[in-house]
Amino acid sequence: MSKTQRSDGDAGSGVVTAHNVGRTYYMGEPVHALQNLSLALEEGSFTAVMGPSGSGKSTLMNMLGCLDTPDEGTVEIDGRSVGDLSGAQRAKLRGTKIGFVFQTFNLMPRLSAAENVTLPMVFNDVVDEGRRERAQTLLERVGLGDRLDHAPNELSGGQRQRVAIARALANEPTLILADEPTGNLDSETGADIMDLFEELHDEGRTILMVTHERHIAEHAERIVHLLDGELDYIEEFDSAGVEDGGPKTAQPTADESIGTSGGDAE
């Protein structure tokens, strides 16, 4: 396996770019969740992030998803510095550019599958007449065209995650952020969900996925490894052996870089 570690802070450019990002939380003693971290997500790329609890994975996802802002450095989405935006502007950017998929699905229990999918459209001021039709199209896309009016408690775990993926696609985001998307699923259902993520990637979606599971991470084009808040190494894969069932082959990274980072509480 090839490994690459760089700390020059030059992330290049992408759909989302972090430049020398730092984030410290104050809970008694300061916790340096991220330090001098740089990363670019290129359009259409599929990146997995791995590392033990406390390694900075969740903080990194929160920064790239405009759920938090750095103390140091900058995060840019489509060339716009997130730190220069107001809270309302960040919320608007988050709602239009980013789709989230969570381990616990985070569906509204009293709403139907279709109504859950329409929620991001409501917040994005999509006209009412088009919401139901788009929700139906998206649910059909994830194999739930016959479950539009089912409540979450009437769906299996895998079906609920499919609803969550459809919801993430509601506003045609530039980026999909997935936090342990198979963590609450059995292995067979998790494999089905990863097949769906691969289909989305094949369609040109940009995906960042946090996972603890190596076999899940290997669905990505590269794996960014964090350890104790710092970059451990980055793997990039070619397709050798994939079509005939063989393992992916790790290749050294040439252009991407991450600096060091501190730990966070997941």
Map each language-model feature to its residues.
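ABC-family P-loop ATPase nucleotide-binding domain
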Residues: 1-22, 232-266
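ABC family nucleotide-binding domain
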Residues: 13-219, 223-227
